[in-house]
Amino acid sequence: TGIVSLQGDSPALSGNWRLSAPALQPLLTQIDVPAQFEKPLGFQGQASWQAGYINISNGLLSYGPTDVTGDLLIDVAGSTLEFDLQSTTPDLTDYAPQNDIIAPAFSIPIDFRSSGQITEERWSVATFQLESTQASVSGSGELELDGDEFIDSHITSDIRIANLTAFSEIFDLSFPDQDLQIIVDMDSRGGALVVEQFDLRSGDSDLSATGQANNPSAPQIVLNVDSDRLDLSPWFALLETAEQSASDSEGAEPDAESAPDRLIPDYPLTHRLLNTFQADTTVSIRELRGLPRPLLNVLTRIDVGKEGIRVTSARAENQRGGVAQLTGTLIPDAEGIPELS
């Protein structure tokens, strides 16, 4: 039941609707829907629509075995997204390719809940929860995106993954055989967004960070990173598979248009991105493993921003008492070509 308005150049719908489709493909005629995603689709609930505006109340969207319930408001003209949604998926294997060997990590239920509001000036998430047998993610907060001060921003997050190898076959990457835990707590204070806690634990490695960011429109970031022991060796296989995947999708060489805009041709760190922020980072690591020989008491200070990359100081010791120190810069010249010194 509902009302259909055809007045003027902006048709509109409103009412209590019950819609169903036995498959997606007839609805998406411009693309080929993979067989594993060809599932019945249904919706029921209070909804209104007109060009650039959708408002759903107490809606229920069913897509195969997945149910999504809640409220959703999309206002393109007002650049606003409001949502209060809950989703359940009994088993992810329902969305795996039928002819492939199903990764054990797929055979899990997923519960998801999120509510908040997103505008051009602010991201606000009151609730974010994702639960499965392999991982749990929770968080909330507000982040200001405009203005010259952080007045009312705060972010908390807790991410726990039992074993990263569960995601290797899902993403076709070689994740290390170890757990991962990340805890984040940030709050605005004196016009700055202060990193009060950032703790990362994975396997035998630990990493903590504190610092602050000023000016939401053009962030100026100061970050202090500290670690008792950081072992890079479990992550090399992941980096290799990620680089191979990127190479396969983009080609062996950067294209002619994107390469000149990059500070380092093989990495997507563009001059445009560097002009949007300034970061001063100090890193202290008591023991760094994963290189040909372990390094001790690593201390570096690196500035990154519109001028490029500047290594103000870098110092490390080896197990025999040797000490190495260096400084350097990677800065674009007047024509935008990076110069290493």
Per-range role (PLM):
Residues T1-S57, S62-V194, S205-A314, G322-S341:
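Membrane-proximal interfacial segments on either side of biological membranes
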